[in-house]
Amino acid sequence: MKANRTIAKTAKPGMTLRELNDVCKKVLAEGCIRLGLIENEEEIGTYYMHSVSHHLGIDVHDVNTLENDKLLPGMVISDEPGLYIDEWEIGIRIEDDLLITEDGCEVLSEQIIRDPDEIEGFMQNR
């Protein structure tokens, strides 16, 4: 959740997907170090195998995959950090869609509940 929220707070015009991925890797690595899964940031690739973002458009994975191209207002990208921990037999991936605005971004999927307690409450009351 922290990586997902950090990307939403960080994404803005002028940034690149590579820069967003570097931010994500740092946040995920800090969490994995706290959990004792890794000893240093360079080991995060053991649990984080993909990039945090790609362009969205007509296709789910839109045509611009150049990670060094700068983001521009009006672009829509994914925010999807994921950790895959084989020894715990789990994978965790939180995904949002972000609209790049003039001064940051808007989370297009903001209304989706993601807090564990809110999800449990929703499931019990359906």
What are these regions (language model features)?
Residues M1-R126:
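Active-site neighborhoods and metal-handling regions in enzymes and metal-associated proteins
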